[in-house]
A protein has these predicted regions:
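Sec-dependent signal peptide cleavage junction
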Residues: 22-36, 927-928, 955
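Extracellular glycan-recognition regions
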Residues: 35-45, 332-334, 340-402, 510, ...
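Blade-edge beta-strand/turn elements of extracellular beta-propeller
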Residues: 42-60, 109-131, 165-182, 211-237, ...
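Hydrophobic core segments of beta-strands in well-ordered, beta-rich domains
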Residues: 64, 68-94, 113, 132-134, ...
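Short beta-strand-plus-loop segments that form exposed binding edges in beta-rich domains
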Residues: 312-313, 538-547, 787-791
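Extracellular and organelle-lumenal recognition/adhesion modules and their flexible linkers in secreted
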Residues: 395-566
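Beta-rich interaction/scaffold domains
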Residues: 813-893, 936, 944-946, 951-953
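C-terminal low-complexity, Ser/Thr- and acidic/Pro-rich disordered "stalk" regions positioned immediately N-terminal
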Residues: 872-873, 877-929
């Protein structure tokens, strides 16, 4: 039958038979132009099976420290017409950070924005001047919704404590930032019934001022671990990740502790948080699913229920959450999973049903994506954040830089220019001099470690300048009347003392008795130091009797160094016209001057604007040297996903410079990469594998040597190199990753091509790589693109695409184009009249790319899956647009059917939108607008009755 004609005719007859009704704008569609609602493959990061069930861990990718909120469909700020969930997660040093993820069913999630573009402009956040923020930055964020406003609170370990960000529009911003200027461990924000804001941190609670800027009440250690020993059968330790929820008459606070079974949920409850009411506790060991949220679900009958949303360590992929259904007993305690038994790979029925087309769409949304770098992502409001007061270079008198500032430091003119500090005697000696003909003997120091030589530096010292000091020292003498035989070595300092008595040590060194020793060091004078009246002094460390020994000193030197410090500039963070997909994050702050999607259309350009560091140290604890790769700026990465993960990219390396290395890396502190390296004009393709071992340890496990040979760490592995011909400027690299979450191991096989068609193995399989448990990076493996310089800046590499697949070359499967052909056929069958023009145009662009991919005789499954999944996702979006009638909300937020949110009944909530009702014969009845039928409408109806379908009436956007 002609579905289009029958449907229009029935509608037109209904209009003609009803006086005073105007033809309502509605979608028009035909049998051969309807996108299928047959479930497509789920995204790489979903465990939604498509049959109404899902498994845990749920997202198959790294989403730690989760905090989840629900915005009810009845909320005036909800424009989606159905319950919406938002989630935030830890991203530490990555930029942008604090991703806001969205879901309609608590199982399928996608990123809609970030809270901030960069967390600070500090050296540590920007990999500047040898500093870094690995394992630091943003930790354990808390997301809350209160009185129409959204709040995110998180702590930082290296950026002056905790911050609160808030906005009235969580998906579009802008966000306002508040610095609390103090730290809280794993803080969670909570608004009490009077609307007062509180921070929950472990077993501590703090009330904030109404403007959220100040702590006005502190209640610490309100409970103790010991009081729960009987309830839990063990004494809990930790109390991390506490979040508080009011459910019925009780306040429930899930927290985690390390119990005898491992990561364990302790659920606390009380009728009042602070009035002394008893806190009860219940222990849940849920297969190591622990820290996270309780989430509320509409039961469809006017009631709601609460369920668990906790994550577990699932390396090498990362820390992955799971939605764990709960039933609540008459005692007011939840029972999670199967009688509180939960295991990885458990399968559950989904708690929220969605209409078939919307279900098909959200299953394809992902936290990772392929990308062809077409600069077609929308500009985000967080990119425009300009909160920064940038550090500026000091104003320096260059005539005092690079010259010796100490007068008579070799004492060839005796004691001229020198005066004793804290008494003591200064004597020029020639017998036993350390250098030249004369040295200085320092005697009669008494009990003063500060007794020694001093010299005025007034008019010579400058704020913000780094100085290098040195001195040669020897001591042989025992002090008169004091047994100092036990003092075999002692610390000496060359220091700057300011007029107010403050002392900054410039050079520090240990001098052994009887050994002539030169101590050296550097120090940067603070920018706010009062340098007027300052002087250079020599001291020994404060110590026991016998440490104010006589000594001889010579060649005291102090030189101001030329400023080699790199200072931030506004161009680093100002938008550069390039907009990346939201799945991408930079390792630390990017420098926007040195990456682009516009310099070469359809390519990502990474330019080396900085050189990597050969001296940088890990800054969070004592975890040793950083590799070159770890100090490379503008490393662009995505999450990995568990199981088989293949990434393919195409690089143009024609503009590399000597000392440059560029490629594709899978990394945490341990890493592997395939890259092109240029040395002495010759480019070589190779593989690097770096396994971090926490340094050299003694028998007790203490780190005794945490230094590395950086060149050796990133040398190409034997048997894994290819010398590139001079004309080989295009290189294709494929990284086939196997992330085995059961064993915790990652293995990688690299492949390469020089023509994009014929592929060869690049070395042997690399691995296994594991998680080092030092918490130094503290995240699952990431995978991304990089380019770094050791010798020269200015070289650049262009990346054509980033194509994902879950099929590995080593699987031995032929390239399968059937799904790509099916998507193309489906797209070709559609008619533009039924869809919003902007979404239709997106589909046409993706259809063209899909056809080009098919015509190119693809050589890998990546080259098929990337365009197929992109096109299939857009077809699913069109199906939702068709059902909603106007496509007003990407993701189906303006649906005419609400779905069965509880699995009970058949809700058809309209989200406040006017709908057509459905008759038994599947025709659509027309809704009344209270307007008269105009001649134009009557003409349109006449044409419809005649079977003429060339006229299209589209719903106007609202």
């Amino acid at each position: 039958m002609n579905y289009l004609r029958q449907k229009i005719s029935a509608s037109a007859i209904a209009v003609l038979s009803t006086c005073g009704l105007i033809l309502a704008p509605m979608p028009v569609f035909a049998d051969d132009s309807t996108p299928s609602s047959t479930p497509s493959d789920g995204s790489y990061t979903t465990t939604d099976s498509g049959d109404g069930t899902y498994s845990i861990p749920m997202l198959n990718t790294d989403v730690p420290d989760i905090s989840v909120i629900r915005v009810s469909k009845d909320d005036p700020n909800n424009k989606d017409g159905r319950d919406v969930y938002y989630m935030v997660s830890t991203t530490m040093e990555l930029s942008p950070g604090s991703p806001i993820m969205k879901s309609y069913d608590l199982v399928n999630w996608w990123i809609v924005t970030y809270v901030y573009d960069r967390i600070s402009m500090s050296d540590a956040s920007s990999l500047r001047n040898g500093a870094s923020s690995y394992g630091e930055g943003e930790w354990a964020p808390s997301l809350r919704y209160h009185n129409g406003r959204f709040y995110v609170l998180f702590n930082t370990n290296n950026l002056n404590g905790a911050y609160i960000y808030y906005t009235d529009d969580i998906e579009n911003g802008p966000w306002t930032k508040i610095a609390l200027n103090r730290g809280f461990h794993d803080p969670s924000l909570y608004f009490d019934e009077q609307g007062s804001p509180w921070i929950i941190s472990g077993v501590n609670q703090y009330r904030l001022s109404d403007d959220l800027t100040t702590v006005v009440e502190s209640h610490e250690n309100i409970i103790s671990a010991e009081q729960f020993t009987d309830d839990l059968g063990e004494t809990p330790t930790g109390f991390e990740g506490s979040q508080t929820f009011k459910i019925g008459d009780y306040f429930y606070t899930p927290t985690i502790y390390w119990g005898k079974d491992g990561r364990t949920v302790m659920l606390l409850r009380t009728t009042d948080l602070l009035d002394g009411s008893k806190y009860e506790a219940k222990k849940y060991y849920l297969g190591a699913f622990a820290q996270g949220s309780l989430v509320e679900v509409d039961n469809g009958d006017g009631t709601t229920s609460w369920h668990g949303f906790f994550f577990r360590d699932t390396y090498p992929t990362g820390r992955i959450p799971g939605l764990i259904p709960a039933t609540w007993g008459d005692d007011g305690w939840p029972v999670f999973g199967d009688n509180n038994q939960v295991s990885a790979s458990d399968t559950y029925d989904k708690l929220i049903d969605l209409p078939a087309d919307l279900e098909n769409l959200v299953r394809q949304r992902s936290l990772v994506n392929s990308d062809d770098f077409d600069n077609d992502a929308p500009h985000q409001s967080y990119q425009d954040q300009d909160w920064w007061t940038l550090e500026e270079p000091p104003q320096v008198d260059d005539s005092l830089i690079g010259i010796e500032l100490v007068d008579n430091g070799d004492f060839e003119n005796g004691t001229e220019s020198w005066t004793p500090q804290w008494n003591g005697t200064l004597t020029a000696i020639t017998d036993g001099s350390l250098s030249g003909t004369t040295s200085l003997a320092v005697t009669n120091r008494g009990e003063y470690n500060g007794a020694g030589p001093g010299q005025s530096m007034d008019g010579k010292m400058q704020q913000g300048v780094t100085y290098r000091a040195s001195a040669t020292i020897r001591y042989d003498h025992e002090m008169d009347g004091v047994d100092s035989s036990a003092v075999t070595s002692h610390l000496f300092y060359v220091a700057i003392q300011y007029a107010d008595g403050t002392i900054n040590r410039v050079a520090t060194g240990t001098v052994k008795r009887g050994e002539t020793t030169t101590i050296t060091g550097e120090f940067s004078i603070p920018s706010d130091a009062n340098v007027e009246g300052s002087k250079l002094i020599v001291e020994t460390a404060w110590g026991a009797e016998g440490t104010c020994m006589d000594y001889v000193i010579d060649d005291i030197s102090l030189i101001g160094l030329a400023d080699e410090k790199e200072y931030p500039v506004a161009e680093e963070y100002q938008p550069n016209g390039s907009n990346l997909d939201l799945v991408w994050e930079w390792g630390h702050n990017p420098d926007n001057r040195y990456w682009s999607l516009t310099d070469r259309e359809g390519w990502l350009r990474l330019t080396n604007g900085h050189k990597v560091s050969a001296t940088a140290k890990y800054m969070k604890g004592t975890y040793g040297d950083l590799t070159y790769f770890e100090t490379a700026r503008n490393v662009l990465s995505q999450r990995t996903f568990g199981g088989s993960m293949s990434v393919e990219t195409h690089m143009d390396v024609s503009h590399m410079k000597d000392g440059d290395t560029a490629g594709l890396a899978t990394y945490t502190r341990s890493f592997a990469y395939a890259a092109v390296r240029q040395e002495n004009g010759q480019r070589t393709l190779g593989v690097v594998k770096r396994v971090y071992d926490n340094g050299v340890k003694d028998a007790d496990g203490n780190i005794v040597d945490d230094t590395i040979d950086r060149d050796a760490e990133e040398a190409f592995v034997s048997g894994g190199t290819v010398t590139l011909p001079d004309d080989a400027t295009n290189v294709w690299i494929k990284s086939d990753n196997t992330l085995d979450n059961a064993s915790g191991k990652l293995t990688i096989q690299y492949w390469y091509s020089l023509d994009g068609k014929q592929w060869s193995k690049l070395g042997d399989e690399q691995g296994p790589l594991t998680y080092d448990w030092s918490l130094s990076h503290f995240k699952g493996y990431r995978i991304g693109l990089f380019n770094y310089a050791k010798e020269n800046t200015g070289g650049y590499v262009d990346f054509d695409y980033y194509d994902l697949s879950d099929v590995l070359t080593s699987d031995g499967k032929a390239v399968d184009t059937s799904k790509l052909r099916s998507a193309i056929d489906q797209a070709d069958s559609l008619q533009s009249a039924e869809y919003p023009m902007d979404e239709w145009d997106k589909m046409l662009t993706l259809l063209d790319k899909a056809k080009q991919a098919l015509a190119s005789d693809p050589s890998t499954q990546n080259e098929v899956d990337a365009p197929q999944r992109a096109l299939s996702l857009q077809l699913a979006q069109l199906a939702v647009d068709r059902q909603s009638g106007d496509g007003g909300n990407p993701g189906g937020g303006d649906q005419t059917g609400d779905g069965n949110q509880s699995g009970n009944g058949d809700q058809t909530g309209d989200g406040g939108q006017q709908q057509s009702s459905t008759a038994d014969d599947n025709s659509s009845e027309l809704s009344s607008t209270g307007s008269s039928v105009t001649p134009m409408v009557l003409s349109a109806i006449a044409l419809m009755l005649a079977g003429i379908s060339v006229i299209r009436i589209r719903r106007s956007s609202r």
